[in-house]
Regions:
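Flexible "arm" and connector segments at domain edges
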Residues: 1-94, 98-132
Length: 132
């Protein structure tokens, strides 16, 4: 069922992309949309204040720390929770970014669902050893 959702979305994007068919247009629109995601997160911090970032060096002291403990030792540096308005803006920007990512996949004849399956397989095989 999930593959149908991805395939439907990919087909819908293919039929709705009219103005920006060039690979160069799609690459630059995708980059721009990713920048807008970043900008909308920054605006949630600087304009709204619903979230804030308190960054510091990520430290852990024990060299014998397990991967589970290591994962818990690191912080996102994010405090607070997105308000409804900021969440909506960020979700819209992520949606636009997904649109152009799928457009790129379409131009390159790459099935997004297959990419997700491959990444899931890597995670299942390597687990925490993927170190991303």
């Amino acid at each position: 069922m999930k593959d149908i959702i991805f395939d439907t979305f990919q087909n819908d994007v293919s039929t709705s992309l009219i103005r920006h068919k060039s690979i160069l247009d799609v690459l630059t629109k995708y980059t721009e949309s990713c920048s807008k995601v970043n900008r909308s997160v920054a605006k949630a911090v600087t304009n709204c204040g619903c979230i804030d970032i308190t960054a510091s060096k990520q430290e852990f002291n024990n060299t014998d720390t397990s991967l589970d403990e290591l994962s818990k030792a690191f912080s996102t540096h994010l405090n607070g929770k997105l308000c409804d308005n900021c969440r909506e803006v960020i979700e819209n920007e992520i949606g636009t970014s997904l649109f152009y990512l799928v457009s790129l996949c379409n131009i390159l004849y790459i099935n997004l669902y297959d990419v997700l399956i491959n990444e899931t397989s890597k995670l299942d095989t390597l687990g925490k050893f993927t170190f991303r």
